[in-house]
Amino acid sequence: MKMQLMAFAALAAGTLLTSTGAFATGLATCDSGPKSSWQPQEKLEQQLKEKGWQIRRVKEDGGCYEVYAVTEKGERVEAYFHPVTLAPVPTKAR
């Protein structure tokens, strides 16, 4: 659990450093398969809220869930998550 939290925090910090306004940016891509295999967006939102995040917006981008939020530390982030596993997805630098 602690390792997952540390990895998640590192991803969030990296996302914060590389994020600026984006839509269909290609910053992240997910081999997510058919939408019938995707987990509900609400499940991701609930998991993030349980971590203390304040969700501003969630949308689809590059086959991933793209989340705009404020973390439990008050940091604004743009983060990507795989829609089947809900795992954080690394992003490409612009």
What residue ranges belong to the model's regions?
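Sequence contexts marking disulfide-bonded cysteines in secreted/extracellular proteins
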Residues: T29-D31, G63-Y65
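Conserved histidines in hydrophobic membrane contexts and catalytic metal-binding motifs
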Residues: V67-V70, F81, L86
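Residue-level signal for well-ordered, solvent-exposed loop/turn and beta-edge residues enriched
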Residues: E75, L86-A87
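A short, surface-exposed interaction/processing loop segment used at functional sites
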Residues: A87-R94
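Extracytoplasmic
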Residues: E50-W53, G62-C64, G74-R76
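Classic N-terminal secretory signal peptides
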Residues: M1-A24
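Short, non-transmembrane alpha-helical segments in secretory-pathway proteins
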Residues: D31-Q54
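Short beta-strand
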Residues: R57-K59
